[in-house]
């Protein structure tokens, strides 16, 4: 278990324990559901078309703490009309102590979103069902593949900063 300091930052690891990856907190940062054409949309006999948009944001909170936000927007079109738009921003605070920058980058880009994704999947499904629509289950996402693609793009752009390079957030 890691200790937490009074400002929310993860306490440095004891030299005897070595590197550590911890989940400090998981929370919903933002959630929205809109069904602009309800209730008439329920009578439409059109095959719905779904569009999924996925985004990840990383913010350094302190020397060893990072916030990772997994944002998912699912839009369902029924012909020319929008059946619903479900948006979820699921976040977590992760402690990464005693790791090199490359390992931190890999964990932020792969393991953190893998930890957050089941929460996103459940919340999206619950929102859609509560809106009166048939259940929809997000299929697994290959975050390792997405991370590899991001690395490739960074290399093409001349080594853009890694996820771990973000500056600590200031107090607003």
Swiss-Prot record:
Q: Where in the cell is it found?
A: Cytoplasm
Domain of life of the organism encoding this protein: Bacteria
- Gene Ontology CC, one term: cytoplasm
Q: Which GO terms describe its molecular function?
A: unfolded protein binding
Residue ranges of the TM segments: none
- Report whether Translocase shows up as a keyword of the record: no
Q: What is its main location?
A: cytoplasm
Q: Name one Pfam family in it.
A: SecB
Q: Biological process GO annotation list?
A: protein folding; protein tetramerization; protein transport
The family database entries (PANTHER family) matched by this protein are listed as: PROTEIN-EXPORT PROTEIN SECB, PTHR36918
Family, per entry:
Belongs to the SecB family.
Subunit structure of this chain's protein: Homotetramer, a dimer of dimers. One homotetramer interacts with 1 SecA dimer.
Name of the molecule in the record: Protein-export protein SecB
Species source reads Stenotrophomonas maltophilia (strain R551-3)
């Amino acid at each position: 278990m890691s200790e937490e300091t009074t400002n929310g930052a993860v306490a440095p690891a004891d030299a005897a324990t070595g590197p550590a990856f911890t989940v400090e907190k998981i929370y919903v940062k933002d959630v929205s559901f809109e069904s602009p054409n309800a209730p008439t949309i329920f009578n439409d006999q059109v095959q719905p078309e779904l569009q999924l948009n996925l985004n990840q944001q990383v913010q350094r909170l302190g020397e060893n703490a990072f916030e990772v936000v997994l944002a998912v927007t699912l839009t369902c079109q029924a012909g020319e009309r929008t059946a619903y738009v479900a948006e979820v921003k699921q976040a977590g605070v992760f402690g990464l102590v005693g790791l090199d920058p490359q390992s931190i980058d890999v964990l932020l880009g792969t393991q953190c979103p893998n930890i957050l994704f089941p929460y996103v999947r459940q919340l999206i499904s619950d929102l859609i069902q509560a809106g009166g629509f048939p259940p929809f289950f997000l299929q697994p996402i290959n975050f390792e593949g997405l991370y590899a693609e991001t690395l490739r793009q960074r290399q093409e752009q001349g080594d853009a900063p890694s996820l771990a390079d973000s500056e600590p957030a200031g107090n607003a």
